[in-house]
């Protein structure tokens, strides 16, 4: 795989961008996610305007999609249709990695650049700020 154009790190996750939305006239965005042991998606959510296709590269990532648990291993594909609540975690002791393809790419690195500082702050995250950022980019939080 070619070297990432940008890497954004936050809360035990690394997002390695290989193809920006701006590279494809907002048709496709491609990035690799590295999930360190114990890390999880910051806020479970669903997307209003785009679908997400995942492909496992390394280790195991536990996804929850529409209330169902799915174990994603290397070589496993997963399609998450827009409006489907989902989240993920690495509950194992080893790093997991997966590719993520966003279509159409109405969502790109801007979201991660904005949310990373909020999730990297010491102490509990600012939930109203997280919600504001998610909604700005068409992600609807599913919080308890």
Where does each model-flagged region fall?
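Short, conserved beta-strand element in jelly-roll/cupin
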Residues: 32-36, 46-64, 101-102
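Structural motif
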Residues: 14, 60-62, 69, 85, ...
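Short acidic-glycine-tyrosine-enriched beta hairpin
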Residues: 8, 67-85
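Ligand-binding loop in jelly-roll beta-barrel domains
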Residues: 24-26, 82-109
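Structural signal for conserved beta-strand scaffold positions within catalytic alpha/beta enzyme cores
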Residues: 17, 100, 141-143
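A short glycine-rich, His/Asp/Glu-containing loop-to-beta-strand
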Residues: 8-44, 50-51
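Short beta-strand segments
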Residues: 42-44, 65-70
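Acidic/histidine-enriched, glycine/proline-rich intrinsically disordered or flexible terminal extensions
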Residues: 113-144
